[in-house]
């Protein structure tokens, strides 16, 4: 029998115990702030605390966090998440929460913060683009309004009934943003073989005094592109009213009955573009031309609603263009599926030929493997794994959002480089000043970063935690052990290594020191 609410009830009880200080067995210090918590909860939610307590569980009652990286409000928010499973940013900057989560190796929170920063950057970019489009459209309306008086003299004659049928599928007269006499519509490439379309387009071009795009300049199917009647306010304001054309007098009545449903409005599109001179030789549209947005055409709309309003001679072209479009989409999706797979196979082949996973597997004790959850690399000790994890969250790998104009951005006073938070700025300033704030109490040697000091401390303690499995020699640094193995035991390691499937580690063999020594002397 299962109790679905058991986990929620357990977290609630642990949260109450933390607030009461009951059974709290550790204290986390962030600057001057103190946080009482339970080691089991911290180690379960953070890889940093897991590696911190792994070797010396009983000797580490107090945990000091770097206040330059982790702020007290950000850690309080992450601590609430550990006990309640809810993340509420409130008024905290996302950059501070991202820096704290990266330092504590809380990967789920890092992904959420990066996603929010990316959405924020996308929103700001979209708003900026809309403002630019609105300004460019208003300028185009002013330039196009100067020639609107010539429209009345260029009205098509009664013999252009085929061209009027094509225009009858347009949802509204306001959706056509075209310069007078320069309006052209994209026709299917197969339309060159249809005499009706070509014969009716030429008289209209002669009467208007301009060149209408012939079928050879079309690149998309007319039936595949119907007019989108739902537009942004900026797009609606920048289009021209073509009501001066007498041949379009019946369009409004047709639109009221045809576009009565909002679903049909959103599903149908036709693309109408503006250019000064359209000819068979021109295939590119300049960046200043106004391009109307279009969305994906639904199958149900194209099958049930749009077909009955198309001209009869365009029906076979519509079916052919739909089939060609579906084939192109299938090929594109196949290419997208093939590319990551091929890249992954190359990566797997490189990992199989690498010696590091096998050496790391042999170096660690039987049954203990310290694997990076992000890149699947293996390390001989939790300390080296912790140092490696910090490389995944370097400054250049983070996603940076464009800060608002009224926000004080951390900026270097010497080189003018900007940063997302104060920690990265302080770390960068050390490159200019040469400051080394971390000093060894034994010899007085200084270091720029705390992990370098921790690595140096082993020199004074004379500890040699890294042992060779075959000759019983011990080393202070893991790099010395790797060089020793490559120099003396490389052939033996290759003979013992068994390649497994891609991205999987080789099985650990139980070799005693006596067996390995005999193997060396053979």
UniProtKB/Swiss-Prot annotation:
InterPro entries according to UniProt: BTB/POZ_dom, SKP1/BTB/POZ_sf, Znf_C2H2_sf, Znf_C2H2_type
Domain BTB: 24-91
Record region (Interaction with DNMT3A): 310-427
ZnF (C2H2-type) ranges: 370-392, 410-432, 438-460, 466-489
Matching Pfam families: BTB, zf-C2H2, zf-C2H2_4
PROSITE patterns: BTB, ZINC_FINGER_C2H2_1, ZINC_FINGER_C2H2_2
Location of this chain's protein in the cell: Nucleus
GO CC field: heterochromatin; nucleus
Residues with Phosphoserine modification: 157, 516-517
Region (Disordered): 121-166
Family designation: Belongs to the krueppel C2H2-type zinc-finger protein family. ZBTB18 subfamily.
PANTHER family registered for this protein in UniProt: ZINC FINGER AND BTB DOMAIN-CONTAINING PROTEIN 18 (PTHR24394:SF18), ZINC FINGER PROTEIN (PTHR24394)
Subunit structure: Interacts with DNMT3A.
Entry function: Transcriptional repressor that plays a role in various developmental processes such as myogenesis and brain development. Specifically binds the consensus DNA sequence 5'-[AC]ACATCTG[GT][AC]-3' which contains the E box core, and acts by recruiting chromatin remodeling multiprotein complexes. Plays a key role in myogenesis by directly repressing the expression of ID2 and ID3, 2 inhibitors of skeletal myogenesis. Also involved in controlling cell division of progenitor cells and regulating the survival of postmitotic cortical neurons.
Protein name as catalogued: Zinc finger and BTB domain-containing protein 18
Name of the gene encoding the protein in the UniProt record: Zbtb18
């Amino acid at each position: 029998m299962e109790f679905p609410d058991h986990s929620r009830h357990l977290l609630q009880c642990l949260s109450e115990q933390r607030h009461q200080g009951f059974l709290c067995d550790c204290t986390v210090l962030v600057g001057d702030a103190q946080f009482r918590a339970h080691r089991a909860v911290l180690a379960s939610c953070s890889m940093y605390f897991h590696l911190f307590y792994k070797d010396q569980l009983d000797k580490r009652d107090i945990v000091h966090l770097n206040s330059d990286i982790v702020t007290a409000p950000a850690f309080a928010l992450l601590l609430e998440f550990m006990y309640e499973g809810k993340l509420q940013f409130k008024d905290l900057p996302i950059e501070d929460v991202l820096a704290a989560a990266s330092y504590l190796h809380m990967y789920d929170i890092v992904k959420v913060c990066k996603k929010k920063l990316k959405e924020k950057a996308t929103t700001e970019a979209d708003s900026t683009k809309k403002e630019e489009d609105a300004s460019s459209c208003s300028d185009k309306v002013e330039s196009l309004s100067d020639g609107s008086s010539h429209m009345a003299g260029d009205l098509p004659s009664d013999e252009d009934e085929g061209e009027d049928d094509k225009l009858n599928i347009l949802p509204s007269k306001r959706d056509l943003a075209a310069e007078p006499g320069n309006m052209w519509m994209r026709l299917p490439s197969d339309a060159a073989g249809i005499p009706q379309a070509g014969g009716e387009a030429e008289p209209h071009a002669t009467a208007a005094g301009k060149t209408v795009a012939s079928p050879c300049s079309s690149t998309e199917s007319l039936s595949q592109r119907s007019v989108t009647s739902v537009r942004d306010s900026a797009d609606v304001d920048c289009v021209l009213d073509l009501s001066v054309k007498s041949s379009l007098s019946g369009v409004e009545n047709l639109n009221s009955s045809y576009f009565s449903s909002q679903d049909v409005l959103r599903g149908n599109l036709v693309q109408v573009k503006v250019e000064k001179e359209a000819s068979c030789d021109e295939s590119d549209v300049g960046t200043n031309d106004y391009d109307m947005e279009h969305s994906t055409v639904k199958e149900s709309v194209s099958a049930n609603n749009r077909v009955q309003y198309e001209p009869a001679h365009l029906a076979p072209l519509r079916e052919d263009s739909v089939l060609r479009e579906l084939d192109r989409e299938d090929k594109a999706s196949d290419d997208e599926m093939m590319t990551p797979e091929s890249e992954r196979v190359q990566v797997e082949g490189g990992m199989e030929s690498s010696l590091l996973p096998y050496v790391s597997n042999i170096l660690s004790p039987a049954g203990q493997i310290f694997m990076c959850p992000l890149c699947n690399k293996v390390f001989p000790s939790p300390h080296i794994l912790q140092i490696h994890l910090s490389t995944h969250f370097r400054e250049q790998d983070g996603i940076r959002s464009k800060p608002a104009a009224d926000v004080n951005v951390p900026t270097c006073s010497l080189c003018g480089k900007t940063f997302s938070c104060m920690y990265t700025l302080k770390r960068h300033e050390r490159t200019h000043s040469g400051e080394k704030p971390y000093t060894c109490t034994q010899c007085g040697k200084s270091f720029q970063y705390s992990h370098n000091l921790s690595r140096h401390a082993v020199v004074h303690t004379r500890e040699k935690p890294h042992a060779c499995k075959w000759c019983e020699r011990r080393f202070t640094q893991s790099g010395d052990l790797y060089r020793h193995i490559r120099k003396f035991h490389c052939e033996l390691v290759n003979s013992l290594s068994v390649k497994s499937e891609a991205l999987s580690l080789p099985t650990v063999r139980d070799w005693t020191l006596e067996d390995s020594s005999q193997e060396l002397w053979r």
